[in-house]
């Protein structure tokens, strides 16, 4: 199979990369009615599989789970989760032939095997759904021409998808129809009904493409969302300890610092995050972020180039074929780092202390978010898509680090995200070491003293922060998410 994106001509590539339309709430007036009375069979009962299924059932849809015979016979976790929640469970052979919509919510590396198994069992004119388009775009999976292929991609982990639905809300969602597989022209109606059934229409839905979702998703998770947080954690911890900070305190400042800092980012973008600093600290954070952007821009661009060309995907799929040798080696090495093995700090760190003593961390967040956004937009991805794949998801990933450090982040994210994270962080750490050696007192671990600032300089800096394109589009998109619950900040 050939990488689908690479089979397109340049005009088609640009058209699909640039497909992005914010859908009006009136477009979802019919809710999930298009799928009511039809049989929806979900393959996979992980975090997305279970929680999307729960939401869809609560929205009045007929939901069941198709699992492998061994999973049922051995009563594995997927079988237990589905049955304990009262769902009908059966084998592929029992459930797939009667399904109107088959939703493949297994991990990326299982998609080809799953599709090859279910496709011969699917009835004529059925639909196949994904929540990530890697199998279609990067693997180049060929789907029978009578089958409609759609995507509904919530921009949150599965647990958040469920929690927001239970609150009567939802999470921002991308939907798409594969242009090669919409024989009856009903793909958009199916995708809209599925998105409404998960609650996504209450938080904002982007009509996108499989290509735009995949390329932007890979870029965000590799760079700012996971790679930058991992590289930043390792670099900042080592710097603090090198300068005499208690390792336990240093570990806590970083582990919970990302979460605290990005909570401000979630509520009010880079503007609010920077406003949490004193004026002298804000000036310094801005200067550091500009230095970081200049240093890291070529690395961000390389990742985007490798994602666009398919170089990243081919390398990762080669590792899949080699029993994940690289991935597992990198995972083991990360677990042995000083940050991951540091003792726990039992004392309290106040919320403002994370900002005052984390000026460098704030600069890293600002630089990483802006670079990821700018690099995606320069590659033809529309600003709304770039926002969701950079700034929007960052607090959610930071929250995983607050739970169990980098280990938890790498467990929760997909194997695809984890592989890309290691590629980025392994390149970024040595790249930034000379920069780290030139830091000043107050950049990390100590507060910058209050002092006089130049009013004109501060005015211009504030204007530069607020006028960045990600702040402009972010203000609009956050307006649709005002009801989303505040992520709990650990102390």
From Swiss-Prot:
GO terms for cellular component: cytosol. It catalyses: (2R)-2,3-dihydroxy-3-methylbutanoate + NADP(+) = (2S)-2-acetolactate + NADPH + H(+); (2R,3R)-2,3-dihydroxy-3-methylpentanoate + NADP(+) = (S)-2-ethyl-2-hydroxy-3-oxobutanoate + NADPH + H(+). Its EC number is 1.1.1.86. Residues 15-208 form the KARI N-terminal Rossmann domain. Mg(2+) 1 binds at residues 217, 221. Binds 2 magnesium ions per subunit. Substrate binds at residue 414. Pathway: Amino-acid biosynthesis; L-isoleucine biosynthesis; L-isoleucine from 2-oxobutanoate: step 2/4; Amino-acid biosynthesis; L-valine biosynthesis; L-valine from pyruvate: step 2/4. Keywords: Amino-acid biosynthesis, Branched-chain amino acid biosynthesis, Magnesium, Metal-binding, NADP, Oxidoreductase, Repeat. GO terms for biological process: isoleucine biosynthetic process; L-valine biosynthetic process. Its cofactor is Mg(2+). Mg(2+) 2 binds at residues 217, 389, 393. Pfam families: KARI_C (PF01450), KARI_N (PF07991). Involved in the biosynthesis of branched-chain amino acids (BCAA). Catalyzes an alkyl-migration followed by a ketol-acid reduction of (S)-2-acetolactate (S2AL) to yield (R)-2,3-dihydroxy-isovalerate. In the isomerase reaction, S2AL is rearranged via a Mg-dependent methyl migration to produce 3-hydroxy-3-methyl-2-ketobutyrate (HMKB). In the reductase reaction, this 2-ketoacid undergoes a metal-dependent reduction by NADPH to yield (R)-2,3-dihydroxy-isovalerate. HAMAP family: IlvC. Belongs to the ketol-acid reductoisomerase family. This is Ketol-acid reductoisomerase (NADP(+)). It comes from Escherichia coli O157:H7.
